[in-house]
Amino acid sequence: MIDTLTIVRPDDWHLHLRDGDALADVVGDTARQFGRAIIMPNLKPPVTTTAQARAYRERILAALPAGTRFEPLMTLYLTDNTTPEEVRAARASGFVHGVKLYPAGATTNSDAGVTDLRRCAKTLEAMQDVGMPLLVHGEVTDPTVDIFDREAVFIDTVMQPLRRDFPALKVVFEHITTKHAAEYVRDAQGPVGATITAHHLLYNRNALFVGGIRPHYYCLPVLKRETHRLALVAAATSGHPRFFLGTDSAPHAKGLKEHACGCAGCYTALHAMELYAEAFEDANALDKLEGFASLHGPDFYGLPRNAGTLTLTRSQWQLPAEVPFGEQMLVPLRGGEMLRWKTV
């Protein structure tokens, strides 16, 4: 039995940090474990320009705890009006590392998202030309499509035409949740990668309904059936370089989760690597954690691997039931429960 595991310092390739006082309360949780993180742009208003990304980056750096070494990797929010010129400016900035596709209405703060990807053809061509990755929330928003099928339908109706029209465009299929997506990414031609969250590795959709509605397990894309969870575990632990860590840690105030119409998102930044270690240990694949968490992501993005290390030890500890979040409180996934790994 392994009791201590030291890996190259990991990165988080999909993270929500919010802004203002809330940002200040959560950014330290990520910086404590990760060297870098891809920062999602779905603020209100969204981060749609390089200038806005620069300003947000400066706010993140200012909010870091003293002595912290952490690099926020910024992204732009793709809209119907994003121009090729903005893409080229973003690429030249050195701090914008992706452009995020949110189908309009697909998730939190996505109302400004793309209504028809065909309107973005010139922008996507510019991204392909300059090597700017497209980060995709892979769900359709057609109300006639069952919520559990939205990812599979997205592959057929959006992803496949996108890859056909822009075969050299680097695409990250974010927070995949289905066997279909895992197989698509594994077998795709050209530069395609995928992030996988800890909660989608650990839980299936039953977790939403144990003893009643469990709002802190509600996220988008929603948890799927066990067949899909097992396929995600197989992908994450396979050692395949197209799969890498992205927490999709998404903090919402307790009152907005425990609500008649609660927000989607699980807060896992506080204990992300502990959760991933648990998932990989359950699959007898702790030896594959370093590749997934620390190596595959920077290799895909064309960035250097981190120089430092992170150590996890087998240690029972109780996760706080809730933590400060601006003027309110935030409930982490599994808040108040015991964990069996701890970062040191």
From Swiss-Prot:
Zn(2+) 1 binds at residues 14, 16, 100, 248. Its cofactor is Zn(2+). It is an enzyme of class 3 (hydrolase). One of its GO terms (cellular component) is cytosol. GO terms for molecular function: dihydroorotase activity; zinc ion binding. It comes from the Bacteria. Binds 2 Zn(2+) ions per subunit. The modification N6-carboxylysine is found at residue 100. The keyword NAD does not apply. Belongs to the metallo-dependent hydrolases superfamily. DHOase family. Class II DHOase subfamily. Catalyzes the reversible cyclization of carbamoyl aspartate to dihydroorotate. NCBIfam families: pyrC_dimer. This is Dihydroorotase.
